[in-house]
């Protein structure tokens, strides 16, 4: 899904943690019982987002959303990783929203600026691919319609 990125911030998304590393993060959260430390939850969410498994990525985003809501001191970090996670799963609308919120508070944040540029490039690229597919489908449809009309004559 991700080629070599020109943005260092996105390169960290390309490498998943090993299942053993992810297990260590999960075990840490579970060992803390009913009320795990926010940092432990954040670390686990980060590991989940780096995963290549879509459901795990969504779980990581969900954990970060809860942390963002419940732990004001972690909002900055949560916003950034919510943007990264949303980007990774292809939810560019939310990725943009999170990056914009971060940039509203920190307009000079280079990582957030790079992420926003990358989101824009990805949306543009996927839009062009979509236009190409739609154009191809239209051409096929016109060709079939033309053939049918000639056949009726």
UniProtKB/Swiss-Prot annotation:
Residues 149-153 are mitochondrial intermembrane. CDD domains: Fis1 (cd12212). GO terms for biological process: autophagy of mitochondrion; mitochondrial fission; peroxisome fission. Residues 1-127 are cytoplasmic. Pfam families: Fis1_TPR_C, Fis1_TPR_N. The C-terminus is required for mitochondrial localization, while the N-terminus is necessary for mitochondrial fission. This is Mitochondrial fission 1 protein. It comes from Debaryomyces hansenii (strain ATCC 36239 / CBS 767 / BCRC 21394 / JCM 1990 / NBRC 0083 / IGC 2968).
């Amino acid at each position: 899904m991700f080629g070599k990125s020109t943005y260092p911030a996105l390169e960290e998304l390309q490498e998943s943690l090993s299942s053993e590393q992810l297990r260590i993060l999960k075990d840490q959260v579970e060992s803390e019982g009913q009320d795990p430390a926010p940092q432990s939850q954040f670390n686990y969410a980060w590991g989940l987002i780096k995963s290549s498994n879509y459901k795990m990525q969504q779980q990581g985003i969900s954990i970060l959303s809860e942390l963002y809501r419940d732990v004001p001191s972690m909002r900055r970090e949560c916003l950034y990783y919510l943007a990264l996670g949303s980007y990774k799963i292809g939810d560019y609308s939310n990725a943009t929203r999170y990056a914009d919120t971060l940039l509203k508070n920190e307009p000079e944040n280079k990582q957030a600026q790079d992420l926003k540029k990358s989101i824009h490039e990805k949306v543009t690229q996927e839009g062009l691919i979509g236009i190409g597919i739609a154009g191809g489908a239209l051409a096929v449809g016109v060709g079939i319609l033309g053939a049918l009309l000639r056949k009726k004559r």
